[in-house]
């Protein structure tokens, strides 16, 4: 699973408790397109396999996994640096994990919409008042009977 496993030095005494810490990282990503509620998208290391992703989630986080699909996202090299050399962003692997047993996942709403109540004397209130005055001023005069202002007196 890991590229190179470094075991701790042997020390006298039993039992030897071994803690396995994987060198991989998985980043939970908000999907760009709408996905089923039981599918979760991760950005993973290029060295990880489908079995690694499944074991990572099931053994460490106790999340039941039904299926894992992966793809490699190749990044472009169209950007140029200050020396006019092409700069390529690193490629990454994306894993789509389908949860088992009718489980669903919904991204938490970290930044909820705040109420539109503005404070008295605030910039937003002054802007709204100005815009309302402009709308009133630009309304056609009802006494003119539909004649445009171009035919003014």
Curated annotation (Swiss-Prot):
Gene3D superfamilies: 3.30.70.330. GO terms for biological process: mitochondrial translation. One of its GO terms (cellular component) is mitochondrial large ribosomal subunit. The keyword Ribonucleoprotein applies. Transmembrane segments: none annotated. It is found in: Mitochondrion. Residues 111-146 have a biased composition (Basic and acidic residues). InterPro entries: Nucleotide-bd_a/b_plait_sf, Ribosomal_uL23-like, Ribosomal_uL23/eL15/eS24_sf. GO terms for molecular function: structural constituent of ribosome. Component of the mitochondrial ribosome large subunit (39S) which comprises a 16S rRNA and about 50 distinct proteins. Belongs to the universal ribosomal protein uL23 family. This is Large ribosomal subunit protein uL23m. It comes from Danio rerio (Zebrafish). The lineage of its organism: Eukaryota, Metazoa, Chordata, Craniata, Vertebrata.
């Amino acid at each position: 699973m890991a590229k190179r496993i470094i075991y701790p030095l042997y020390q006298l005494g039993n039992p030897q408790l071994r803690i396995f810490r994987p060198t991989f990282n998985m980043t939970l990503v908000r999907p760009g397109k709408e996905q089923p509620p039981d599918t979760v998208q991760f950005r993973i290391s290029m060295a990880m396999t489908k079995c690694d992703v499944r074991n990572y989630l099931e053994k460490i986080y106790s999340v039941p996994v039904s299926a894992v699909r992966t793809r490699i996202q190749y990044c472009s090299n169209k950007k140029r640096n200050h020396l006019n050399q092409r700069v390529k962003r690193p490629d990454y692997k994306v894993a789509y994990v389908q949860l088992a047993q009718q489980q669903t996942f919904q991204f938490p709403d970290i930044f909820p919409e705040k109420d539109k109540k503005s404070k008295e004397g605030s910039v937003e209130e002054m802007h709204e008042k100005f815009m309302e005055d402009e709308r009133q001023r630009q309304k056609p005069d009802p006494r003119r009977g539909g004649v445009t202002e171009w035919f003014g007196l």
